[in-house]
Amino acid sequence: MSQIESQNPEPVFQLKGSMLAITVMELARTNLEALDRQLAAKVAQAPNFFSNTPLILALDKLAPNEGPVDLPGLVRICRQHGLRTLAIRANRIEDIAAAIAVDLPVLPPSGARERVIDPIEVEAPKKIPEKPPEPLIKPTRVITAPVRGGQQIYAQGGDLVVVAPVSPGAELLADGNIHVYGPMRGRALAGIKGDTKARIFCQQLSAELISIAGQYKVSEDLRRDPLWGSPVQVSLSGDVLNIIRL
């Protein structure tokens, strides 16, 4: 290696932040046989949703008297149904130890990411308040071609408008609203960074999944809605998705 190369090495990698839509499975009981049966029923309702889907296993909602989790067996059942476990969320010592034993990352329990810090009062010099900067609003992203199965389209910082059909297995994501002027047969996730005022509009509700700010319904639930197949507007009230006719 020359002296110039050793002093100025060419980088071989980059570390970048990324926003991914990841499903969280909150386990209520450790009965893996029942889990296997219920997962099979879910897969039958929305097979495209369970195709190599990244998953966080949440064990922090288990009751204190619930028995130990067969974590390798749990991961194996999820994999058989198309769910790929990336990490677990846990607070019981035995669950954390089991995850470490199979080399799975352990995330903090739900609600444990923030901690209260007692403030130290420091008298700061008075400043003239500055006018807050205008929010950066990105233009609406408009898609005019059909969205095929396996495609993922993301409108960062704004709304997404699709004026063509959306096929099963396709995924639409937006920080703001989603408009689909055609049949919506894939997945639509609006307000993915937590905007609870985001909405979903579509001319024909036939979706595998709809979600606003993390609250979602799958096709199994949507098919029971009397507005299935109709033009609808979807909004969020608390943690409930409201579907009304357009």
UniProtKB/Swiss-Prot annotation:
- List, alphabetically, the HAMAP family matched: MinC (MF_00267)
Q: Name one GO biological process term.
A: regulation of cell division
Described function: Cell division inhibitor that blocks the formation of polar Z ring septums. Rapidly oscillates between the poles of the cell to destabilize FtsZ filaments that have formed before they mature into polar Z rings. Prevents FtsZ polymerization.
| Assembly and interaction partners | Interacts with MinD and FtsZ.
Recorded hits in NCBIfam families, A to Z, give: minC
Output this protein's name.
Probable septum site-determining protein MinC
Q: Which organism is it from?
A: Pseudomonas savastanoi pv. phaseolicola (strain 1448A / Race 6)
Family the entry assigns: Belongs to the MinC family.
Q: Record's InterPro entries?
A: CAP/MinC_C (IPR016098), MinC (IPR013033), MinC_C_sf (IPR036145), MinC_N (IPR007874), Septum_form_inhib_MinC_C (IPR005526)
Q: Which UniProt keywords apply?
A: Cell cycle, Cell division, Septation
Q: From what superkingdom does this record's organism come?
A: Bacteria
